């Protein structure tokens, strides 16, 4: 493994468990696949890497393992692309008479430990560390704040481009010693 700097993002479909419980299995899997495909494309378009899909959540990273000087900007652009992709997916779902999806995206920049993780029999490229945990916690805050994209102060301070953002007061998140 190696220590690298990058921007980690998590996106999670909101209220997906009730959807799965009340939807035929084929439709639930098809909907999730359509969502993941659209989000994967948006992340890749902005030079990101999708690390894993877990349940209704997707984990991505920008700047790792391939260095990107503007990884924070790329992550915010990817999140905006994900917003547009979800809007288009929901337009298609509406035409088909299906309910709309909503999601939250958390973004955090910092150092990660990157490398192959797992067992002797099965491993995958993974990121470990506080940056990953905080990005996940920030995604969780999107529900509380009623927003679809939320970036940490560390990410915002690294931005080189201009983005319209609303500032939120710092908040404590589980597993992190200071407010973000």
Name each model-derived stretch:
Residues 54-55, 94-106, 148-155:
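Acidic/histidine metal-binding catalytic segments
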Residues 72, 123-128, 167-171:
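Allosteric regulatory "coupling" segments in signal-transduction proteins
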Residues 33-48, 64-105, 130-143:
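Alpha-helical scaffold within the catalytic cores of cyclic-nucleotide enzymes
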Residues 20, 62, 116, 159-160:
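Activation segment
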Residues 112-114, 135, 141-180:
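Cytosolic regulatory/linker segments at or just downstream of nucleotide-handling modules
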Residues 61-71, 105-125, 141-145:
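Catalytic strand-loop-helix junctions within cyclic-nucleotide turnover domains
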Residues 2-78:
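Catalytic NTP-binding/metal-coordinating core of nucleotidyl cyclase/transferase enzymes
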Residues 2-5, 100-102, 121:
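Short loop/turn elements that form and flank the Walker-type P-loop nucleotide-binding site
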């Amino acid at each position: 493994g190696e220590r690298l700097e990058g921007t980690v993002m998590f996106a999670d479909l909101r209220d997906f468990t009730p959807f799965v419980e009340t939807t035929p299995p084929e439709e639930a899997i098809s909907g999730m696949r359509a969502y993941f495909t659209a989000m994967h494309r948006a992340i890749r378009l902005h030079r990101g890497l999708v690390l894993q899909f877990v349940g209704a959540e997707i984990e991505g990273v920008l700047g790792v393992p391939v260095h990107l000087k503007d990884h924070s900007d790329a992550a915010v652009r990817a999140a905006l692309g994900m917003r547009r992709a979800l809007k288009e997916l929901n337009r298609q779902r509406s035409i088909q008479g299906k309910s709309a999806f909503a999601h939250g995206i958390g973004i955090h920049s910092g150092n990660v430990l990157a490398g192959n993780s797992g067992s002797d029999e099965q491993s995958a490229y993974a990121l470990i560390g506080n940056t990953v945990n905080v990005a996940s916690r920030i995604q969780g805050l999107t529900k509380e704040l009623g927003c679809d994209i939320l970036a940490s102060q560390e990410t915002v301070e690294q931005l080189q481009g201009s983005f319209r953002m609303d500032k939120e007061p710092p908040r404590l998140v589980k597993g992190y010693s200071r407010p973000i």
